[in-house]
């Protein structure tokens, strides 16, 4: 965004290489540019939250949320991106920008009720997934060995900002669970202060004695694992919070498998 013609001309010069390749340029004010950024991220956060809420409904009525996502995504007005059910959104942008746009609206005495409810629903997301963990373990979490595969807020990063693992792992510890985790990024800082949490150097050591394996982050490393050989526990539960595994293959391999919205 710019505030005068000279600044606008400089911006055009700066982005000339991209504009020559077909990129679009919006001649906006500085405040307009700020609102574009906030609104874009708030809208994407809304899509994630929307599909997560539909996943809750899908589990209740016995349909597959993946079918819903694909079907919706075929509509070009909607598109399939950011329609993957999973944990709460995190990272450096969506949580910050949704709160910022709500605060801006409040400053100007305007109510953004949709975005406020998106924030509220996202904050409640980890609680819903933790309730499912408890139910899968028959409400007996104490002394259960639970492995998290991935702790970052998304794959291919070491960014832990607002990751839902920062909510779920401490909650499970408080209920007496023993946690191991492995993340391909090698991240191992945030959980050092907790007892009964340990970082594993590889997938095998993380899962060897697990009662439950939670796929928290959609790293490619986790998409082709042989769960029969990973844990010494015969009835290990695999809770796929990213739906990156095939339910049919898990059933064929006789794995005690559960996904999101399935």
Please name every model-derived segment.
Residues 1-262:
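Structural/interface elements that position substrates and couple domains in central-metabolism enzymes
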């Amino acid at each position: 965004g710019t505030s005068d013609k000279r600044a606008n001309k400089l911006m055009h010069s700066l982005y000339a290489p991209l504009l020559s390749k077909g990129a679009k340029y919006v001649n906006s004010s500085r405040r307009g540019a700020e609102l574009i950024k906030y609104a874009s991220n708030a809208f994407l956060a809304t899509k994630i939250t929307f599909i997560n809420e539909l996943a809750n409904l899908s589990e209740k009525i016995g349909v597959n949320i993946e079918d819903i996502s694909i079907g919706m995504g075929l509509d070009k007005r909607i598109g399939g991106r950011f329609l993957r059910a999973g944990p709460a959104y995190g990272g450096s942008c969506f949580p910050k920008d949704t709160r910022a746009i709500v605060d801006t609206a409040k400053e100007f005495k305007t109510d953004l009720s949709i975005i406020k409810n998106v924030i509220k629903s996202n904050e409640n997301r980890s609680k819903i997934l933790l309730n499912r963990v408890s139910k899968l373990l028959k409400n007996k979490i104490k002394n259960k060995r639970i492995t998290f595969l991935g702790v970052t807020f998304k794959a291919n990063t070491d960014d832990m900002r607002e990751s839902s693992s920062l909510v779920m792992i401490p909650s499970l510890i408080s209920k007496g669970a023993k946690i191991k985790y492995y993340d391909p990024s090698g991240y191992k800082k945030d959980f050092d202060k907790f007892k009964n949490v340990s970082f594993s150097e590889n997938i095998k050591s993380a899962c060897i004695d697990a009662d439950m394996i939670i796929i928290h982050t959609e790293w490619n490393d986790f998409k082709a694992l042989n769960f029969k050989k990973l844990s010494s526990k015969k009835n290990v539960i695999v809770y796929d919070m990213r739906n990156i595994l095939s339910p049919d293959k898990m059933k064929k391999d006789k794995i005690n498998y559960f996904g999101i919205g399935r």
